[in-house]
Swiss-Prot record:
GO terms for cellular component: cytosol. Belongs to the methylthiotransferase family. MiaB subfamily. It comes from the Bacteria. Residues 387-449 form the TRAM domain. Its EC number is 2.8.4.3. This is tRNA-2-methylthio-N(6)-dimethylallyladenosine synthase. It comes from Rhodopseudomonas palustris (strain BisB18). Keywords: 4Fe-4S, Cytoplasm, Iron, Iron-sulfur, Metal-binding, S-adenosyl-L-methionine, Transferase, tRNA processing.
Length: 473
C-alpha cells in the first residue's frame, strides 16, 4: 500500500486565502496527500501568500529562508521536500520568487491552483514550474468537491467563494492586478456547494469575495442575481442557521442587500464595510469614488433596515498627502459611526499601483503617531461594544471545545467569542447564553433557559444601555 504524502499549507492574509488553502487540500487529496501541522516533516509545503502589504510579502521570503534549511535537512535524510508559493505574491512576483529563493519548486497564481497536480509533476521531472497567467477556464469547474470527512473535520462554519477579483482599482491596492477582473459564480453552483456543506454538519456559511457585494452570478432564471437575492435563496437551505458575507465595497451596496438584512433572520447583523479614510480629499486620491457623507448615509440605510446591525471597517493612515485635517476627518468619522471593531494600517506602497508614484509622502513618525491615536479610538469603541453585552442574553452558535477543560466556545452574531461550561453535545447548536463577564475579547457566561427573543440580545433593567454609537444625517 502506498504511503500517503504529507502536505503542509501556511496561509497569510485574508479569508479568501483560508478558503483557497482548503480547496488546494481538496485538489491534492486524490494525489495521495494528507495534511500535517508540521512543515518539517512534509513532502510538500505550500505558502499561500498575501501581497496587500509590504510586510506580508517580506514574511513570505523570511519563511522561505527557513524552509530552504528544512529542505536541505530532508535531502540529507534521503527525502524530497517540494516547496510551492501560491497566492497573490506568486501572481505579482512570478519568476522573481525563484530568483530570490532557488529552493522553490512551484509558483502558482490564485487563479491556477487547480493545476497544482500537473505543476508538481512538472517539478518532479527536475524542473521548476511557474503558472501566473489568468486562465480562460474556470478553476471552480475543475476543483474536486471536498470529501464528507474533510468537511466534518473543518467544523461547523465554512467559507464559500461566490466572487473573485475587483474592478474598482483603488490607487493603493494590488488586488485587481493579482486576482483579476470581477467574476461571479453561478447561483446553482453555489447552492450545490452550500447543500453539500449543510448535509455534512456545517451550520454557518460566510460568502466571500474580494468585493463580495459586486456579486452578479447567473441565476436559475437566466438573469444575473445580486448578492441580496443569493442570500434569500441560501437562507432556504435546511441546516444553515447563519449567513455572513465579506468583504464589501460601499459603492456596490444595493437595496436588495439592505432588504436582506431587514428580512432574513439567518443573515447576521454584522457588516464589514471598509471606508479607508474619513477625508473626501484622501478618498478621491484613493479612487474610492464615494465621499465620507456617502458612507454615512449608507450606514444609516443599513441601520434603518435593521437597528441591530453593527459595523467593522478598514482604515489606512499616512496615505500620500494626508494632512492633519484629513486625519482629523477620519477620527471624526470613526467617532460618529461607532464600530464594533476595525483594522487600521499604515500606508504601504505596493509596486505597480498608482499611489506608489505619489511624491507627497507622510513621514514614518507621523504615520506611527496617527496609527496609535486611531487604534486607541477603535479599541475603546470595541471595548464599549463588548462591555455592553454584560448582563444580557445573547444567541451563540457553539463551534468547538475551548482550551479550558469543560468549556465550549461559540460566537455571537457579532463574532464575539463566548465561553460556557457545558457538554460537547451543544456544538452545532444556537443557544441563549447569559453573559456574566468579559475576559479581554471573550465573553464568559452560562447557558440560559430557552426563551423567546425579540432580537439578538435581551437586557435586564439594570444592564448597560444600547451600543454607544450614533449616525450621521
Amino acid at each position: 500500500m502506498t504511503q500517503p504524502r504529507k502536505l503542509h499549507i501556511k496561509s497569510f492574509g485574508c479569508q479568501m486565502n483560508v478558503y483557497d488553502a482548503q480547496r488546494m487540500v481538496d485538489a491534492l487529496a486524490p494525489e495521495g496527500f494528507v495534511e500535517t501541522a508540521n512543515a518539517d516533516e512534509a513532502d510538500l509545503v505550500i505558502l499561500n501568500t498575501c501581497h496587500i502589504r509590504e510586510k506580508a510579502s517580506e514574511k513570505v521570503y523570511s519563511e522561505l529562508g527557513r524552509l530552504r534549511v528544512a529542505k536541505d535537512e530532508a535531502a540529507l535524510q534521503g527525502r524530497r521536500m517540494n516547496i510551492a508559493v501560491a497566492g497573490c505574491v506568486a501572481q505579482a512576483e512570478g519568476a522573481e520568487i525563484i530568483r530570490r529563493q532557488p529552493a522553490v519548486d512551484v509558483v502558482v497564481g490564485p487563479q491556477s491552483y487547480h493545476h497544482l497536480p500537473q505543476l508538481l509533476a512538472e517539478a518532479a521531472r527536475g524542473g521548476r514550474a511557474l503558472e501566473t497567467e489568468f486562465p480562460v477556464d474556470d478553476k471552480f469547474g475543475f476543483l474536486p468537491p471536498p470529501q464528507p470527512d474533510a468537511i466534518r473535520a473543518r467544523g461547523i462554519s465554512a467559507f464559500v467563494t461566490v466572487q473573485e477579483g475587483c474592478d474598482k482599482f483603488c490607487t493603493f491596492c494590488v488586488v485587481p492586478y493579482t486576482r483579476g477582473a470581477e467574476v461571479s459564480r453561478p447561483v446553482d453552483k453555489i447552492v450545490e456547494d452550500v447543500r453539500r456543506l449543510a448535509d455534512n454538519g456545517v451550520r454557518e456559511i460566510t460568502l466571500i469575495g474580494q468585493n463580495v457585494n459586486a456579486y452578479h452570478g447567473d441565476g436559475p432564471d437566466g438573469r444575473p442575481w445580486p448578492l441580496g437575492a443569493l442570500l434569500h435563496h441560501l437562507a432556504k437551505i435546511p441546516g444553515i442557521v447563519r449567513l455572513r458575507y465579506s468583504t464589501s465595497h460601499p459603492r456596490d451596496v444595493d437595496q436588495s442587500l439592505i432588504d436582506a438584512h431587514r428580512d432574513l433572520p439567518a443573515l447576521m447583523p454584522f457588516v464589514h464595510l471598509p471606508v479607508q479614510s474619513g477625508s473626501d480629499a484622501i478618498l478621491a486620491a484613493m479612487n474610492r469614488k464615494h465621499s465620507a457623507d456617502d458612507y454615512r448615509r449608507l450606514v444609516d440605510r443599513f441601520r434603518s433596515a435593521n437597528p441591530a446591525i453593527a459595523f467593522s471597517s478598514d482604515f489606512i493612515v499616512g496615505f500620500p498627502g494626508e494632512t492633519d485635517e484629513d486625519f482629523a476627518a477620519t477620527l471624526a468619522l470613526v467617532t460618529q459611526i461607532g464600530y464594533a471593531g476595525a483594522y487600521s494600517f499604515k500606508y504601504s506602497p505596493r509596486p505597480g499601483t498608482p499611489a506608489a508614484e505619489l511624491q507627497e509622502t507622510v513621514s514614518a513618525a507621523v504615520m506611527d503617531e496617527r496609527l496609535v491615536r486611531l487604534q486607541e479610538l477603535i479599541d475603546s469603541q470595541q471595548a464599549a461594544f463588548n462591555a455592553a453585552v454584560i448582563g444580557t442574553t445573547v444567541e451563540v452558535l457553539f463551534e468547538r471545545a475551548a482550551r479550558n477543560p469543560g468549556q465550549i466556545v461559540g460566537r455571537t452574531a457579532y463574532l464575539q467569542p463566548a465561553h460556557v461550561m457545558a457538554a460537547p453535545d451543544i456544538i452545532g447548536q444556537v443557544l441563549p447564553v447569559r453573559i456574566d463577564s468579559l475576559e479581554r475579547y471573550s465573553l464568559i457566561g452560562e447557558l440560559a433557559a430557552p426563551q423567546q427573543h425579540s432580537g439578538f440580545a435581551t437586557r435586564s433593567e439594570d444592564s448597560p444601555q444600547s451600543l454607544p454609537i450614533t449616525t450621521g444625517a
